[in-house]
């Protein structure tokens, strides 16, 4: 069984290129080899990268017992744990998904809206007029507070909240290092590496999460609480079985890490462009302040930011048996990783003319296509928290736009380069801005979002 052709450089070179400069590496490979090519990242199985939407549809709608996303995500196991919804396959994954999905839809989301606004307003109140703000860091503080409150219902001034926030910050700082992804891959494949550098932070986070679980299981008011942990503790499958402490720990860690890092990054990339395109910023502010009729500009900004700079460059499926992607290639061997590339699909010129241009108007009156806009993955593996993330981005961006006037810290910079934080593509300098002015929250409550 032959693999599609791909770069001929050594696996060490390809691994380094993927780690340090993933988008250029993917783009140059597509230019040379087309929409399907094989890369060798050394410490994982061969990776067949796919950037044709029709083939991506075939991957996302294929037999999940053959195209195993959990096995394809094993690089995440050292942090998220083996019972994370991202690491499970087959019936175990479907069971977990059914238990978790209801917590992130419908009336549950409406209940989080005011929480998101309140936390964002408190953060803005702490920003100093005339001072430089790294918006990546500022948004991270906001999204971390939101997810902590949503998951645990914690008082933001409590000792346990502070400890959990500090432990997560230590993990994030480690993930900012250039070797974090390689370290995670080596640990996931049981190879020696530098895992000892981050393990104490993970252990500290685990102790706090397990303490929350134990405390909440015994809470007399459990049935009255509306935080996600309490709701998950009460959730049962069709056999009347709930989630174990280990399952809860892994799902909570997944929501903590995935629930704020990618959202933070998408908003930082949105502002990286908005600060350089004043007309687009003014339109967002006018909509947020209720000065213009809501035509969906905020959502268009979010869709375009996540298209142009998707936080995750590709997703993965591991083949449990030989499987045919393209007839001309024949079946791919079992163990091969098939990887739809979000980055490459989002930068196809035949789908998105001038793909590097930031043009939110692409999305006005347009619903994103399932296989051409996929920052949340697709198929039965689409992110369970996608609705939460989109609501959070909408509320945070509108609140910030309604209350603040921000300008670039370095007006001479035309764009910000990409850096890597574990598996996430972030603005290299954190989207540096100066706060020129700030309106009081009472005078600038963001306009209601159209349903």
Question: What kind of feature is each model-predicted range?
Answer:
Residues 1-4, 68-76, 92, 108-265:
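Cytochrome P450 heme-thiolate monooxygenase catalytic core
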Residues 1-95, 110, 114-122, 204, ...:
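N-terminal membrane-proximal hinge/A-helix region immediately C-terminal to the signal-anchor transmembrane segment
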Residues 15-34, 207, 292-328, 349:
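Conserved cytochrome P450 K-helix E-x-x-R motif and the immediately C-terminal K′/meander segment
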Residues 30-31, 120, 166-170, 289-293, ...:
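Cytochrome P450 proximal C-terminal region
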Residues 220-226, 283-296, 308-329, 345, ...:
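Cytochrome P450 fold signature focused on the C-terminal beta-domain
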Residues 262-281, 285-287, 387-404:
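Cytochrome P450 catalytic-core helices
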Residues 340-366:
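Conserved cytochrome P450 K-helix/beta-meander segment immediately N-terminal to the heme-binding cysteine loop
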